[in-house]
Regions:
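Glycine- and other small-residue-rich loops at beta-strand/loop junctions that grip anionic moieties
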Residues: 59, 80-84, 108-112, 133-136, ...
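A polyampholytic, Gly/Pro-enriched intrinsically disordered region
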Residues: 122-131, 153-154
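N-terminal nucleotide-binding beta1-loop-alpha1 segment
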Residues: 159
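Acidic/histidine-enriched active-site and ligand-binding environments that engage anionic O-linkages
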Residues: 147-156
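Short, solvent-exposed coil/turn elements at secondary-structure transition points
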Residues: 34, 54, 108, 136-139, ...
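Structural detector of well-ordered beta-strand residues that form the stable sheet scaffold
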Residues: 29, 79, 101-103, 131, ...
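ATP-dependent carboxylate activation and anion-phosphoryl transfer catalytic cores
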Residues: 7-26, 48, 71-73, 89, ...
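ATP-binding N-terminal substructure of ATP-dependent carboxylate-amine bond-forming enzymes
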Residues: 1-126, 138-146, 179, 396
Length: 450
């Protein structure tokens, strides 16, 4: 087992990784920018190293600084968390070249799945169902029009190197297509340095359902069920739950085994998530995330499997200790992403937390690096923490979530807690009758007023 792990991240995920390391008896190294000197993961780690000024490009994305921190501390492995360098294949290669283990997938799989066009082609070859669309990047507007007419409008123009909703535009008619192509290309170039785009059939009211996988790189891989991430705003997930209200056990087992078989074929290593749109009883592959997900605790709550701990084990060369037949699903779990933002305008609200009281009780988990007196810096993602609740049934889980949300106190900054308090009292959410466009319609209709 590794002796010392450097955690190349910040916030709640840095603390989450630190806890897994402690439970394995592994020494921890926290890295931080000057803005994060008082962060909780820095306080709790065995060692800490300042890697640069507040800007992420000068600190958390600064590969030479991270390598220096590994050398100074003698860390023999790096866990990248999510975001930042977690899906950077070159970073994984550089670490390996310097004798440091990367706790994550093989670089070739990170690179493959980071290219959305190649990822879709590979998924299709592996037997994973995909959304009808172009076979590769669009070469001209004329080609795009021909493909769009073939698959039928509306269509979605997507950046090949995209993610997080950037470089995505809908064209409802042939007349809309040139503008959608031009806008998506411009956004893709600005965000990813690559203006390649491709076309997919636009699904009007799908759910966003993802399958959690875990592989050991030796040909063993399992699935850990699904998460329903359909409550989204601007393609950003807000609330996740498992199991999905839309799936039954046979549908879950079928798509899960398709995905797990595909991961066995490529000898996938570490945790990963295969994401689908789901409509009219059919799954359509959209992408694969080759990292731990923000919403991984939902899966941990219903399977009692520590995903971060398993990431560390298999990165050290261990075979999976869990067979598919050993995976059991218990009850229901829901996660709310609590952001330091205005709940209506979603403007970030950095500042000092004056009062902080996270909820507790049976079946309640809070993954957060916040504490009373903590000053939320303005330089990074506004995620304050995650409230995860488990119950024997979905109904019990929702009642427990209502109670936990009402108990949660954060003063000094604005948060999205009021949004979640409204959502868990809405009939559609209570019935599980929502899709990926539902939340934006709810907000537009004044579902939550400032």
């Amino acid at each position: 087992m590794f002796d010392k792990i450097l955690i190349a991240n910040r916030g709640e995920i840095a603390l989450r990784v630190l806890r897994a390391c402690k439970e394995l008896g592994i020494q921890t190294v926290a890295v931080h920018s000057t803005a994060d000197a008082d962060a909780m993961h820095v306080r709790l780690a065995d060692e800490s190293v300042c890697i640069g000024p507040p800007a992420a490009k000068d600190s958390y994305l600064n590969v030479p600084s991270l390598l220096s921190a590994c050398e100074i501390t003698g860390a023999d492995a790096v866990h990248p968390g999510y975001g930042f360098l977690s899906e950077n294949a070159r970073f994984a290669e550089i670490l390996t070249e310097h004798g440091v283990h990367f706790i994550g997938p093989k670089p070739e799989h990170i690179r493959l799945m980071g290219d959305k066009i190649e990822a879709k082609r590979t998924a299709q070859k592996l037997g994973i169902p995909v959304v009808p669309g172009s076979d590769g990047a669009i070469k001209s507007d004329q080609d795009a029009l021909a493909i769009a007419r073939d698959i039928g409008f509306p269509v979605l123009v997507k950046a090949a190197a995209g993610g997080g909703g950037r470089g995505m535009k809908v064209a409802d008619t042939a007349a809309d297509l040139p503008v959608a192509l031009a806008t998506a290309r411009t956004e893709a170039k600005a965000a990813f340095g690559d203006d390649a785009v491709y076309l997919e059939k636009y699904l009007a009211t799908p759910r966003h359902i993802e399958i959690q996988v875990l592989g050991d790189g030796l040909g063993n891989a399992i699935h850990l069920g699904e998460r329903d991430c359909s409550l989204q705003r601007r393609h950003q997930k807000v609330l996740e739950e498992s199991p999905s209200p839309a799936l039954n056990a046979s549908a879950r087992a079928e798509i899960g085994e398709i995905v797990a078989t595909a991961m066995r074929q490529i000898k996938y290593l570490s945790a990963g998530t295969v994401e689908f749109l789901y409509q009219d009883g059919r799954f359509y592959f959209i992408e694969m995330n080759t990292r731990i997900q923000v919403e991984h605790p939902v899966t941990e709550m219903i399977t009692d499997i520590d995903l971060v701990l398993e990431q560390i084990r298999v990165a050290d060369g261990a075979a999976l200790a869990i067979d598919q037949k050993d995976v059991e699903f218990h009850g229901h779990a829901i996660e709310c992403r609590i952001n330091a933002e205005n709940p209506v305008s979603f403007r970030p609200s950095p500042g000092r937390i004056v009062h902080y009281h996270p909820p507790g009780g049976m079946g309640v988990r809070v993954d957060s690096a916040a504490y009373q007196g903590y000053a939320i810096p303005p330089y990074y993602d506004s995620l304050l923490g995650k409230l995860i609740v488990h119950g024997k049934t979905r109904g019990e889980c929702l009642m427990r979530l209502k109670r936990a949300l009402d108990e949660f106190v954060v003063d000094g900054v604005e948060t999205t807690l009021p949004l979640f308090r409204a959502l868990v009292r809405d009939k559609d959410v209570l019935d599980g009758a929502y899709h990926i466009h539902w939340l934006e319609a709810f907000l537009a209709s004044g579902g939550l007023e400032e």
